[in-house]
Design a protein with these regions (language model features):
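Serine-dependent carboxylesterase/thioesterase catalytic core
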Residues: 26-28, 32, 57, 73-179, ...
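Short, surface-exposed "cap/lid" segments of acyl-processing enzymes
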Residues: 19-64
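Catalytic nucleophile-loop/oxyanion-hole region of alpha/beta-hydrolase
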Residues: 64-76
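Serine-hydrolase catalytic core
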Residues: 159-223
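C-terminal catalytic-base region of ester-bond hydrolases, centering on the histidine
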Residues: 196-291
Length: 291
């Protein structure tokens, strides 16, 4: 081989290695929201494959559409069973994108899986601190109720069998919420329970927590719930950093934030059902965290 050909051989060797480099992205798992299913996430899947070629993207087909109103802990167990094999087969870990109600399902999954390997946990407009508002979803399920009266139904044993009621957080009925919430209150460490330390340790295994939301969402109420903020009893929004569960570091949020692991991405002009198909949202808030 002549000296003049050696650079050519080197270049070809590098080019042959490129496909394996390109396909080295971690798998992405998508968890849908209320009244959603995998079909709603085809655009997002395309965004991921265009920017990160070769990425394995799985949208979990479970509790789709009307089945999404099943109790949250029931859904958590089902999604856990579906997600665990994907995590186990991914030596370098996975990324998790969770939309709307799916964000709370993902929180439940990660709190109760001892050795998960989620690297980036991306919450896409999720009611992380709860929901309290007359959105179109609310009126679809509870047409005869107004938000100020829904606690009469949600804070009962029967109401707690419906997903929306599992994270209904009435700021004017704090005692009833803490007493009757079987999902959100224990998950956010707002009530004492035997698993609180264990759940906290599991959740803190993540490397990056990305919170995405915006003021024009129209469904998540208040929209700051997507940033772990929520109303006080005067319906004034109290930001994440001033919430009791943050101050007490009940589930590790304060620690993650102090370590620089929490990223907030606020985008105006995006309606709730458009978050996962808005390319600017993908570019600004999601793409960089999927390596």
């Amino acid at each position: 081989m002549t000296d003049g050909c050696r650079p050519c051989v080197f270049i070809w060797a590098v080019l042959l290695l490129l496909p394996s480099v390109i396909m080295a992205y971690r798998p992405v798992i998508i968890v849908h929201g209320l009244l959603d299913g995998p079909a709603q996430f085809k655009v997002l899947t395309n965004f991921i494959n265009e920017s990160h070629p070769g990425t394995s993207v799985t949208t979990i087909a479970l509790y789709d559409y009307t089945a999404s109103v099943k109790p949250m802990w029931q859904q958590v167990e089902g999604f856990k069973e579906a997600i665990s094999p994907i995590m186990e087969s991914a030596v370098d870990g996975v990324h998790l994108i969770c939309f709307s109600q799916g964000g709370l399902i993902c929180r439940g999954v990660l709190a109760t899986v001892p050795h998960h390997n989620v690297r980036s946990l991306i919450f896409l407009s999720s009611p992380l601190a709860g929901q309290y508002g007359d959105s179109s979803y609310f009126k679809h399920f509870f047409p005869i109720f107004i938000k100020s009266r829904l606690y009469h139904f949600c804070y009962t044993s029967f109401g707690q069998k419906i997903s929306i009621c599992n994270y209904w957080n009435d700021p004017h009925q704090r005692e009833r919420y803490l007493k009757n919430s079987v999902f959100l209150a224990p998950l956010n460490g707002e009530v004492n329970h035997d698993n609180s330390t264990e759940w906290r340790n599991h959740f803190m295994h993540i490397e990056k927590l990305v919170l995405i939301g915006g003021p024009d969402d129209g469904v998540i109420t208040p929209w700051q719930s997507s940033m772990f903020g929520f109303y006080d009893d005067d319906e004034t929004v109290i930001d994440m950093e001033y919430q009791d569960y943050y101050a007490s570091d009940a589930f590790g949020l304060k620690t993650l934030n102090s370590e620089g692991a929490v990223e907030k991405c606020v985008v105006s002009g995006v309606q709730h059902t458009h978050w996962h198909s808005d390319y600017s949202v993908y570019q600004k808030c999601i793409e960089k965290w999927l390596t």
